[in-house]
Each structure stands twice: as structure tokens, then as C-alpha cells.
Amino acid sequence: MKGSGRLNVLLFFFIPVLILFAVGFVFGPLGSSFFGTKIPAFLQVPKPHVELPAEPVAHIGHFSVTNTLIASWFTILVLVVLSLILTRKMKLIPGKRQAMAEAIVEGLLNFVESVAGKKHARALFTGVATIFLYVISNAYLALFPFFGSITVKSSHGEFALFRAANTDVNVPLSIAIMSFIFVETWGMRALGVSHYLSEFINFRQMVGGFKQLLKGKMGQGVMDIVFGFINLFVGVLEIFSHLTRMLSFTFRLFGNMTAGEILILVSSFLIPAVFSIPFYGLELLIGLIQALIFSGLTLVFGTIAVSPHEETE
């Protein structure tokens, strides 16, 4: 009986989905090109139009307010409101909302501790958790129906009021810059400015080599000067590698999120109704992965910023 009941439930959901898929395929743009069917009004989906730059929907003086900027503000507002709701009237014995907030914080803290250790976990937690929550919230909120469907008219034309923030290259770039600043300031604060910068620019061995030459120790002096130049060159490469992190952060997030949005738009257009549902599930997974990668790499770089120094002490 239990087996037949489960089968009936599966058929109850599977058959309507299959019917919707068949209708969407036959009468949608893809099926109409094969069978010559006419697309009914309820299946008509606007043709996908990909615009990489964010569209301005308003102006404040010379400052353009774009739809991705509005989406970013909306994400921040949602995070603030949710944090207030989940942490309202906190008690020693947590309720459901407080337990949910504690589970999120504890999960992120355990994630940070697993990489940085307890010594540095709390110092790195705020930056890493903020980046994770902001990136994943941008990704998940963009899947709601009102993103792209609510339009406004401006002097430049009619545009969507909300557009996925992560699909504007400026948003991933701004997060990457903040990640870079967070890691570098953390390294300077933890070790001291001069100590931290000495990993990149260090003339001590080169100066020591010249001192050896003045003392008449030619072999040792030349050796120290040569290795001093090598260390200086390696330091310049290290500076360059730190700067290029921002580029890799930016285009990884921007590329994956933009590709996901295009995939959903195209699948919804070709076969309306249910064909795009699996891709929404895929975007949920990709949003989580991208948030983990962005915050995880920030965590790793923050840990590396102090680890080599501690090993030499």
C-alpha cells in the first residue's frame, strides 16, 4: 500500500509536468519552428536580450542609478531586515528564529576555523561571512520572478527595475576590491606594517652584500647582492599576484552568474512553462558554490597573509 501510494503521488506530480513540457515544446518557439504551430498568448515569452552593461533607471545629479545598483541595495536591505528578525528578543534557550540565526553563524564560524584555526578565526570571520552572505543573497534573490519583470521608463528607454547584481561586472569588482583591502589590512594589522611589507620589498640582503664588499669579502658580497636582486624580483611578482586576485575574483563570479542568467532566459524562451525549472535548481547550486569560492579564497588568502611569517618566527 505504501509503495502504491508513493507511486500515485509521483504520478500526480509527474504527469502534469510532462503535459506542460509537451505543450511548451510543441507550441513554444522551438516546437513552432518544427511543426509550424502557432504560439498561444499564455506561452509567449519575450525574446532574450542580453545587455552586459547595467541600465540606468534614474539619475541623481550626474550620478546614474542602475538596476543592478538597486538590486544591490535591495540585497543589503533584505540581509539587514532578516538579521533583525532572526535576532529579535534573543533568549538563553533559543526559539526557531534565533536557532536559525545561530546555525548560520556557527556554520560559517566552523568553516573559517577549519581553515584559519581558532587563533585567527574570529578576526577573519566578519569579512568572510559578509562576502559569503552578500554573494549568495545576490544570486538567490535574482531568481525571484520580479527580477526582470518589473520595468520602468527612463530617458534612455524601458528597462527592468531589478537585475541580478552579480551580472554587472562592477559589483563583483567592488566585492573583489573589498576582499583585497580586507586581506592586506588584516596582514598589516596582525604583523605590523613594516613586517608585512618586508615580504614584498626587502633590501636587507642586498645592503648586506654591499657591506660585505666594503669589508673585502668579494665572494660573499656578490652572492648576497645577486640573491638580494632575486628576492626583490620575487617580491614584485608577489605584489603582482596579489593585484591579479581581484581580476580572477571579478571575472569568475561575473562570468558564472551571467552565463546562468542567459541559460535561464534561453531555456524559458525556447520551451516555456517547466523546461527552465531544472536550470533554476542548477543556479541555486552555482550561487552557493560561487559564494563559497569567493569567501573561501578570501579566507585562504587571509590565512596565508600571516602563516609564512609565523613559520619563520
Model-derived segments and spans:
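Selective transmembrane helix interface/packing segments
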Residues: 1-313
